[in-house]
């Protein structure tokens, strides 16, 4: 949980760069970004003009 909170704080400051190796996603998740929580789990998120939208905090993309 600490790692996720740290990632969220970093995303709010710099949405497309920083810790967790930000990666722009393609195909079904086009328009979203991912960051590594650890080797197994990814934080998948999107950014609007006013909000951070988190769509997943578990597994690598979808399981």
Where does each model-flagged region fall?
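Enriched for short, Lys/Arg-rich terminal
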Residues: 1, 6, 16-19, 25-26, ...
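Acidic-basic catalytic patches of nuclease active cores, encompassing PD-(D/E)XK
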Residues: 12
